[in-house]
Amino acid sequence: MDKLDDYILTVLKKCITPRKLPFLYTILAGRRTGQAVQDAHLFQVQHLFGLMPNLKSRFLEARLIELTDQGMVASTENGYIVQTDIELFFEQDYPNFQGFAFQRQAFDFFAHLRLAVQVLSNKHHQKSYYLPIIRDKKVQGFIKNWLRNKDQTVLANQLYEELFEWIKKLNVAKPAFLIERFSGGDLMGNTTEQIAAKYQVEKWEVYFEVLHEIHRLLAFIKKNPQDWALLESLVPSEITALTSSALQTYTLWQNGADLDTIEQIRNLKISTIQDHFVEIRATYKEASVPYLPDEELIKTINQSNWRLLREIKAAFPDLDYYQIRLAVVSKEGDK
């Protein structure tokens, strides 16, 4: 069993009841459907949400079949369920994941950072012609704007200092896994597979180790941005975490449109608009959204471990299901 199996089994085990492939895929890949956003919080797996955005459904299915053949998972009519008492270490090994909170930010930040390191290093080595390590045009545009009107020598020195501080202050367990991803001068950064082969570990250990350190750093930056001025400037806005449709709804809401007006303007079902507000509240815990229950009621609801929305409805009959979903995703903390 490798770290990917550990991740899959951990999510599955926390859900308690059988879960089908589409559900597991949306959680692991971080597809922000209304159901996925709600269930990730209901089953308290939001910290594990979206750690594998490039995951393919067929690949996940093949893994689940392997786990079934190994006797770790049972496949039932209602979905997959962990059927052994095997001890899992994913959360113990990686206690600081904040998957839902940093889902998009983590990957975009690291892409920005890798390209920034390459550009500044190549400038230092007077290397004018090279292939960008990141081909994404949005990332390239971000770094181009980031570099504008700045002294690149000063920038390079400051970035080096903050990277060194990252490794030192956060006591990064396996710094080589991070450092060897960077490119500059005549050195080309290694892939996850190349690093795994070099250090004789499985590739998923490298993958999750690097991602976990990025999440740890983002948490530190969020608490004390002034201590990481340059690295903080490479972190994309939290707004990028929202789906484009939810962002459109949020923009209308911030500009004074009420729920009915948004429904008319966007020509969407009210249930879809409600999904957007559930996603918005899950992303921004302080966001004011339509028909949000009061804070004391939200706290009361989230003091218990619920498995079904109808259980909450039975206990709080005056709330509709939209309000219940808002309360569920409002829970503070990442686990």
Per-segment meaning from a language model:
Residues 65-78, 219-220, 286, 332-335:
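A short, conserved structural fragment
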Residues 24, 194-199, 262-264, 309-316:
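Short alpha-helical "recognition helix" segments of helix-turn-helix
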Residues 98-190:
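Extended compositionally biased segments used for macromolecular assembly or nucleic-acid engagement
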Residues 1-55, 138-154:
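Short, amphipathic alpha-helical interface elements at domain boundaries
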Residues 6-16, 175-189, 242-257, 295-307:
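Short, amphipathic alpha-helical "recognition" segments used to contact nucleic acids or chromatin
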Residues 59-73, 212-214, 280, 331:
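Basic amphipathic alpha-helical segments that dock to polyanions
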